[in-house]
């Protein structure tokens, strides 16, 4: 079926790793809340020329089927009313996921793939996807303490960009879904011209639009002197999700890079990168 004709779904990159299964379980609530399918996508890396002999292709297909079956079973065990689809492709994982993102509502991946064994380093597929996908992307890390209204925050930075309304909409929807409070931060650098009043005024206008739609979501604003990454490091495990704009390439690159990933990994914090396509 042509990708553009597929109905929207929540796509999860499966690669046989535990983080991929955790991403699938995290994505169950996303699919259930939207009443759309959850699609488990495994991409078989093409062989180098001359390597396909001796049953290598058959072994790769068997590994793909086993990985998808395991993830499917884990999702079924969650016992949620979600339709689960399965797709196995023959191309590089990042290529396959970016292609799928054109028709997806959200693409979810684990922070560490099967070929990356250092927890402080984000997988190359996840990093490339965050910067190139055509839909929102979640790089999932399981939180290390129970998520509750008073336990862990969803953090979003309000920087005065034109897509702050989209960001706040995404944050409020996630907060209701995850039963979490929201902290909206504005970051200022020492010695930089003060545009904080304008940013806060814009933020207040957007919050006035969104909060009546989500009266059950607790929202707190915070002014931060310094970098977003330093602020997140200080929060530690009291934050379980950070939401960034896809247009904020500097911070996206920072948080999928080594320093940012180390902070998010220690906290067990999911990164959600949102563009104008958020549903």
From Swiss-Prot:
GO CC terms in record: peptidoglycan-based cell wall; plasma membrane
InterPro entries found in the cross-reference section: Rossmann-like_a/b/a_fold, Universal_stress_UspA, UspA
GO terms (BP aspect): response to stress
Pfam family, one: Usp
Description of what induces expression: A member of the dormancy regulon. Induced in response to reduced oxygen tension (hypoxia), low levels of nitric oxide (NO) and carbon monoxide (CO). It is hoped that this regulon will give insight into the latent, or dormant phase of infection.
Knockout-associated phenotype: No visible phenotype under normal or hypoxic and normoxic stationary phase growth, nor in mouse- or human-derived macrophage cell lines.
PANTHER family per the UniProt record, alphabetical: STRESS RESPONSE PROTEIN NHAX (PTHR46268), UNIVERSAL STRESS PROTEIN UP12 (PTHR46268:SF6)
Family label: Belongs to the universal stress protein A family.
Identification of the protein by name: Universal stress protein Rv2028c
Lineage of origin: Bacteria, Bacillati, Actinomycetota, Actinomycetes, Mycobacteriales
């Amino acid at each position: 079926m042509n990708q553009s004709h597929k109905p929207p779904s929540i796509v999860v990159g499966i690669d046989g790793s535990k983080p991929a299964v955790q991403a699938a379980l995290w994505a169950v609530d996303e699919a259930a809340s939207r009443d759309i399918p959850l699609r488990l996508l495994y991409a078989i890396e093409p062989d180098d020329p001359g390597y396909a002999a001796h049953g290598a292709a058959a072994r790769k297909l068997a590994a793909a089927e086993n990985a998808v079956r395991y993830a499917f079973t884990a999702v079924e065990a969650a016992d949620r009313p979600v339709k689960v689809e399965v797709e196995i492709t023959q191309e590089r994982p990042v290529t396959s996921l970016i292609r799928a993102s054109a028709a997806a509502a959200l693409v979810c991946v684990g922070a560490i793939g099967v070929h990356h064994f250092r927890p402080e380093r984000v997988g190359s597929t996840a990093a490339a996807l965050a910067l190139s996908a055509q839909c929102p992307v979640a790089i999932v890390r399981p939180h290390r303490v129970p998520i509750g209204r008073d336990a862990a925050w969803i953090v979003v930075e309000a920087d005065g960009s034109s897509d702050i309304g989209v960001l706040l909409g995404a944050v409020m929807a996630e907060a209701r879904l995850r039963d979490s409070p929201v902290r909206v931060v504005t970051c200022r650098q020492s010695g930089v011209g003060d545009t904080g009043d304008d940013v806060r005024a814009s933020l207040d206008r957007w919050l006035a639009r969104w909060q009546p739609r989500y009266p059950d979501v607790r929202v707190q604003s915070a002014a931060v002197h310094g970098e977003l990454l330093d602020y997140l490091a200080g929060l530690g495990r009291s934050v379980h999700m950070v939401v960034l704009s896809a247009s904020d390439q500097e911070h996206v690159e920072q948080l999928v890079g080594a320093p940012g990933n180390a902070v998010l990994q220690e906290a067990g914090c999911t990164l959600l990168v949102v563009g104008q396509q958020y549903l």
